[in-house]
């Protein structure tokens, strides 16, 4: 089915509708799983020596110093244009503003007289950021990860990226307060962050995107007792656009293509109650596709993508919630009015002037988002991901005395005698003091 095929949702059977919303299959092959497991074990056992061997094998690079020096970072900064530095500064300012606003006030309540309960937040002590390499370095992800880590107060923030690390990544790391940067990529970088080596410190939590090997490595270390937590499950990038007859076809097409160019496994979907809009968007996609350097990648992604005509906007919202897109763009006359009906989406973009690119780079929201349907249970990355909540309780003698019989009754019902005794002993002590 080509992207030019216009699908009438209400002419499809329930089975066909489910198939239309299926994502491209993702699963790590047995060979990837085994290879990653071997890499993790090797790095854990052999440390820096294993990292250097894997860099030579996979990155075809001889790494003398794993840690990037301050001089190298300063030189990278000198090579960047002032225009790019200024653009990064604007983006960081907006990201700071939005994520600082996410700070939660402490909870401090008396649930009953003499029983005080609190909830306080503490930063995750150490975090590791993974940034992929390649021809198009994702320095914007450095901004999205390192900025909230700094605001949260994480004591140790380190970054790994495959050598040679792009100047943009090094400058972004410095700009956002990353303390150490390491010339390590792939699954071996995840292993180094999870277990620690002579050069790379072990961290409590790992953030960042990557290829199938990196994704599998993150999954595996998150399940090992001696490993590390991870940010969220990862999958191919995706966008769903809801548009009515008031939308601009060229705008819609550009948003669909900006997602499709990420990779051949990306998925884009258009939902519209207007068949003419669907046809106009399809034509605009073809026109714009011809001008893209990554046209072949985008075209492959479009093979698993959909143009769907619905009964009305309410049905568009219903289908979108069923799919739960990573990015949801609403280009309708009443875009803001539809938000209350949206229950599952990573990030929502309202109106003609809110392209996904704004959130990807500089509006202030985070571009690290749940994909592959995980929006049903996962949130977009935010300050809370770099923090942990801790509860505190304090009972006075009056509060304890009032609650004691309740606790004893509940503990006895669960046949946890020691729990009951911990209360009874204190009750008896109070009686003796009286």
Swiss-Prot record:
Example of a GO biological process term: L-histidine biosynthetic process
Cross-referenced CDD domains: Histidinol_dh
Alphabetized GO MF terms: histidinol dehydrogenase activity; NAD binding; zinc ion binding
Keyword line: Amino-acid biosynthesis, Histidine biosynthesis, Metal-binding, NAD, Oxidoreductase, Zinc
Note on how the cofactor is bound: Binds 1 zinc ion per subunit.
Active site: residue positions: 326 (proton acceptor), 327 (proton acceptor)
Keyword Metal-binding carried by entry: yes
Binding sites annotated in the UniProt record for substrate: 237, 259, 262, 327, 360, 414, 419
Pathway(s) served: Amino-acid biosynthesis; L-histidine biosynthesis; L-histidine from 5-phospho-alpha-D-ribose 1-diphosphate: step 9/9
Assembly behavior: Homodimer.
Function in brief: Catalyzes the sequential NAD-dependent oxidations of L-histidinol to L-histidinaldehyde and then to L-histidine.
Protein name: Histidinol dehydrogenase
Organism listed in the record: Escherichia coli O157:H7
């Amino acid at each position: 089915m080509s992207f030019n095929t216009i699908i009438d949702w209400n002419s499809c059977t329930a089975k066909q509708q489910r198939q239309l919303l299926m994502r491209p299959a993702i699963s790590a092959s047995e060979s990837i799983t085994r290879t990653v497991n071997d890499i993790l074990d090797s790095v854990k056992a052999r440390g820096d020596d294993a990292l250097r061997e894997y860099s030579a094998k996979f990155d075809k690079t001889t790494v003398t110093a794993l840690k990037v020096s301050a001089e190298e970072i300063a030189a990278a900064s000198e090579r960047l244009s002032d225009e790019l530095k200024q653009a990064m500064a604007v983006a960081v300012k907006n990201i700071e503003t939005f994520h600082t606003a996410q700070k939660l006030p402490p909870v401090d309540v008396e649930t009953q007289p003499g029983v005080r309960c609190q909830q306080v937040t503490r930063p995750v002590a150490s975090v590791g950021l993974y940034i992929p390499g390649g021809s198009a370095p994702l320095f914007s992800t450095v901004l999205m990860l390192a900025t909230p880590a700094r605001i949260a107060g994480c004591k140790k923030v380190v970054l790994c990226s495959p050598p040679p690390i792009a100047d943009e990544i090094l400058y972004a790391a410095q700009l956002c307060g990353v303390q150490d940067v390491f010339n390590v990529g792939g699954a071996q970088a995840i292993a180094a962050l999870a277990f620690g080596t002579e050069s790379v410190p072990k961290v409590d939590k790992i953030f960042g995107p990557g290829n199938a090997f990196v994704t599998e490595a993150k999954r595996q270390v998150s399940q090992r007792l001696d490993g590390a937590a991870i940010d969220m499950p990862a999958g191919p990038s995706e966008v769903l656009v809801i548009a009515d007859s008031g939308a601009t076809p060229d705008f819609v097409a550009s948003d669909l293509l900006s997602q499709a160019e990420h990779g051949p496994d990306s998925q884009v979907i258009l939902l519209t109650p207007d068949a003419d809009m669907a046809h106009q968007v399809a034509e605009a996609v073809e026109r714009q596709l011809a001008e893209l350097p990554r046209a072949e990648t985008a075209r492959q992604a479009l093979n698993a993508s959909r143009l769907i005509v619905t009964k009305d906007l309410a049905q568009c919202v219903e289908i979108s919630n069923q799919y739960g897109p990573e990015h949801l763009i609403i280009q309708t006359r009443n875009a803001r009015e539809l938000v209350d009906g949206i229950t599952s989406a990573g990030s929502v973009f309202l109106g003609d002037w809110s392209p996904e690119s704004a959130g990807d780079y500089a509006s202030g929201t985070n571009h690290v988002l749940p994909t592959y349907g995980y929006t049903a249970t996962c949130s977009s990355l935010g300050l809370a991901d770099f923090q942990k909540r801790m509860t505190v309780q304090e009972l006075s003698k009056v509060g304890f005395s009032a609650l004691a019989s309740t606790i004893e009754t509940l503990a006895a019902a669960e046949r946890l005698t020691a729990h009951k005794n911990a209360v009874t002993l204190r009750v008896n002590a109070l009686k003796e003091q009286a």
